[in-house]
Amino acid sequence: MGFTDETVRFNLDDGNKKEISETLTHVYRSLEEKGYNPINQIVGYVLSGDPAYVPRYNDARNQIRKYERDEIVEELVRYYLQGNGIDLK
């Protein structure tokens, strides 16, 4: 599949936003409880797609795998921009 020079749209269901946020919080806390660096582990998962970066502890692995990685990235970008005063419409 080739790349196109045209801009394409990507839309995330609004209902998923809160669920993704809650899931990331749950995964972060589970990683922290197990003694891992949560940021490094979540980044490793998002970049590679390898679920081994997230432990089964507290069902964290199954929880994060409910979402596509691009949905997670979108929520992270949205949260970052809003936290820096960008008014997202």
UniProtKB/Swiss-Prot annotation:
This is UPF0297 protein SMU_2079c. It comes from Streptococcus mutans serotype c (strain ATCC 700610 / UA159). InterPro entries: IreB. Pfam families: IreB. Belongs to the UPF0297 family. It comes from the Bacteria. NCBIfam families: PRK05473.1. HAMAP family: UPF0297 (MF_01507).
